[in-house]
Structure formats: structure tokens, C-alpha cells
Regions:
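Short beta->alpha connector loops at strand-helix junctions that form conserved
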Residues: 36-37, 60-61, 94-95, 117-122, ...
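Glycine-rich phosphate/diphosphate-binding loop of Rossmann-like nucleotide-binding domains
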Residues: 6-42, 155-238
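Conserved PLP-enzyme active-site core in the AAT-like
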Residues: 57-61, 226, 239
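Residue-level detector of alpha-helix initiation sites
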Residues: 76, 137, 178-179
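Glycine/serine-rich phosphate-binding loop and adjoining beta1-alpha1 elements at the start
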Residues: 2, 8, 79-171
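An N-terminal-biased, well-structured beta-alpha scaffold segment characteristic
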Residues: 2-107, 111
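Short, hinge-like loop/turn segments at secondary-structure boundaries
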Residues: 50-54, 132-136, 213-217, 237
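Short gly/ser/thr-rich secondary-structure transition/capping motifs
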Residues: 52-58, 73-75, 152-158, 216-222
């Protein structure tokens, strides 16, 4: 198969659809991979890394699209690019399929394009591996960014999230005990915060305790509990 990896166009987007290690695995299976020059730069991967993995570097988005049978992107092509897609081509990306306009879907259907949304890929047990990975990253970053926003420099209360001798740690309240919330809690605990999690699901809260242990305080998400938690929180994360 011919697989194309174009450079992402959106501002401040640093992700790339495939790392050099993934390219190497595909090449070893007999596939040919075309990577647009600079596609991995934002993620810390040089063109030379992709070449060492067996990819061929192309010097334009159009060439990456036209050479590929499977086009792998982070963000789906813009509607203006649909005419560049080849009949029968497969495009794997975050399509946000429920939000795609019907007329745009019709164009893709007319051109015989197979659109695979990364956001709807599921394992046999119903879990979503790509969304889970993104949520874990977002949760960890949320805890780190939140910790920095507690500093005076950023308009915060001047609190060190982990506290210090004689000074208590920050109180972090997380609303939601899903993948993102658990990831945020894990990082916040590592930073030394006192973490309280609220959710409407007792099984989810139980899973948090089983995964992270007793350092996390759990509360059923009711109005009285919300009012109580928000009253003592130094930092609140909606997850």
C-alpha cells in the first residue's frame, strides 16, 4: 500500500499522524510511506528520522496526497481539498464525522472516499484507543497548566500545588472521573496536590480509588457536594 503523511495545516498544531517508529513498522510489512517535508518537526521528528525508518520525503502536501492510497492525517482535509482526493482513496483522520455537513459527505461519497474517523475507532471491548490517548495527554497537561496558574505571576493565589514544610498543598477538585479526569488526578498527585473527584457514577468513583488509591477523595456529584467542594477548592478542573 502507498501511505501518505502530510504536514498539518492548522495553526499551533504540532502533532503528526505517524511517528518514525510507525513508519518503520509499515515499511517492514512491505508498504511504501510518503512523508511531506517537515511533517514531524513540531513533534520533534526530523525528516532524516523518517528517511532512516524507510519513508520517502516529498516536498509538498499535494504530492503526499496524490501518491497515497491511504492518507493519514491528524485533521481531516479541508473541503476545498476534497477535489484533490483520488477515487477509492482512504483518509484516516479526526473527521468529527457527526459535524460534517451533508453536502460535504455527498462529495466524499461521489468520489468513493473511505473516511475513517480516529475518534470512532473502537477496540472489541468498546474502548476508544485514540481518544483515550488524547484524553490522557489532555488530563496530564491540564494538571500541569493548572498548577502554574496558581502562581502569582499568572494571577493565581500564590499557592505551590504540592505545598512545603508547614504549608499545606493545594486543593484540586476534578469534576468527572473519566479518562481525562483520572489522568489529571494521577499527575496532580505526583505534584503533591490534595485531589477530590466528583462524578455521577459510583462505579467510576470506585474505579478511581482502585486505580489511584486512597489519596484521592471521591464524592458523588450532587448539588450539595458540588457547593462544598467548590467552597474549599484552590483549583477546579472540568473533565
Amino acid at each position: 500500500m502507498q501511505i501518505g503523511i502530510p504536514k498539518e495545516l492548522r495553526a499551533r498544531e504540532r502533532r503528526v499522524a505517524l511517528a518514525p517508529s510507525g513508519v518503520r513498522a509499515l515499511v517492514q510489512q512491505g508498504h511504501q510511506v510518503w512523508v511531506e517535508a517537515g511533517a514531524g518537526a513540531g513533534a520533534g521528528f526530523a525528516d532524516a528520522d523518517y528517511e532512516s525508518a524507510g519513508a520517502t520525503i516529498v516536498f509538498g502536501r499535494l504530492e503526499a496526497i496524490l501518491r497515497s492510497e491511504i492518507l493519514a492525517c491528524v485533521h481531516a482535509p479541508e473541503p476545498a481539498e476534497y477535489e484533490l482526493l483520488q477515487p477509492g482513496q482512504t483518509v484516516i483522520a479526526f473527521w468529527a464525522l457527526p459535524t460534517v455537513r451533508p453536502d460535504e459527505i455527498a462529495i466524499l461519497q461521489e468520489r468513493g472516499i473511505t473516511a475513517i474517523g480516529l475518534e470512532v475507532i473502537e477496540e472489541a471491548d468498546g474502548s476508544a484507543p485514540v481518544l483515550t490517548a488524547m484524553s490522557e495527554i489532555a488530563g496530564g497537561l491540564a494538571a500541569i497548566i493548572g498548577a502554574s496558574l496558581l502562581l502569582n505571576e499568572f494571577g493565581g493565589k500564590g499557592i505551590l500545588i504540592g505545598g512545603t514544610t508547614g504549608v499545606p498543598q493545594a486543593q484540586l477538585v476534578i469534576l468527572g472521573a473519566g479518562v481525562l479526569g483520572r489522568a489529571a488526578a494521577r499527575v496532580a498527585l505526583g505534584l503533591g496536590a490534595q485531589v477530590t473527584m466528583l462524578d455521577t457514577s459510583i462505579p467510576r468513583l470506585r474505579a478511581v480509588v482502585n486505580e489511584l488509591g486512597r489519596p484521592v477523595t471521591t464524592m458523588l456529584s450532587t448539588l450539595p457536594n458540588l457547593e462544598k467542594a467548590l467552597g474549599f477548592a484552590d483549583l477546579v478542573l472540568g473533565a
